[in-house]
From Swiss-Prot:
It catalyses: N,N-dimethyl-1,4-phenylenediamine + aniline + 2 NADP(+) = 4-(dimethylamino)azobenzene + 2 NADPH + 2 H(+). It comes from Bacillus sp. (strain OY1-2). SUPFAM superfamilies: Flavoproteins. This is NADPH azoreductase. Induction: Constitutively expressed. The gene is azr. Gene3D superfamilies: 3.40.50.360. Its EC number is 1.7.1.6.
């Protein structure tokens, strides 16, 4: 089964990127890295569909059996970079596809608001966010390294995502939409 991990931070050395890379490496996922990809600000113009970064994003998500969205929390919401990437996607990429949500919060404040903003945006594209979600604080990622205490939290959410990926594979089979 194909797993796609979207790093929602525009920072090349951000904590969220450390987490996203860990997930992609540990679980043989494909990383779409918003710190590297040159995804322009979404404007709704038809011409944006032909951009390579947009085609790559849409193709990866559509081909995935499951998606992990990782974001920092900026001003009580997901990053603008992640929201921008979601604006390029639609229900045709997310149909019958489970999505795991993970937020990396800094400064000891929350992360839950980033998750809530992801839920709201995902509802608009009929994405199926799984019940389990993770908030990691700044203590979980320090000096570019993922702390050992964060790894079980990540493994648990990916384990649940993979279970949902199996279920949705069967659902698609029964619906004849594979």
């Amino acid at each position: 089964m194909k797993l796609v991990v979207i790093n929602g931070t525009p920072r090349k050395f951000g904590r969220t990127r450390v987490v996203a890379k860990y997930i992609a490496d540990q679980f043989e996922g494909e990383l779409y890295d918003l710190a590297i990809e040159e995804l322009p600000l979404y404007n709704g113009e038809e011409s944006q569909r032909d951009l390579e970064a947009v085609k790559k994003l849409k193709t990866l998500v559509k081909a995935a059996d499951g998606v992990v969205l990782c974001t920092p929390e900026y001003h009580n919401a997901m990053s603008g970079a992640l929201k921008n990437s979601l604006d390029y996607l639609s229900s045709s990429e997310f149909i019958h596809k489970p999505v795991a949500l993970l937020a990396v919060a800094g400064g000891g404040k929350g992360g839950i608001n980033a998750l809530n903003s992801m839920h709201a945006s995902l509802a608009g594209v009929y994405a199926n966010a799984i019940p389990k979600q993770v908030v990691l604080d700044g203590l979980h990622v320090q000096d570019g390294e993922l702390g050992e205490d964060a790894k079980p939290l990540i493994h648990d959410v990916v384990k649940e995502l993979k279970a949902y990926m199996s279920v949705y594979k069967e659902v698609k089979k029964q619906l004849g939409v594979e």
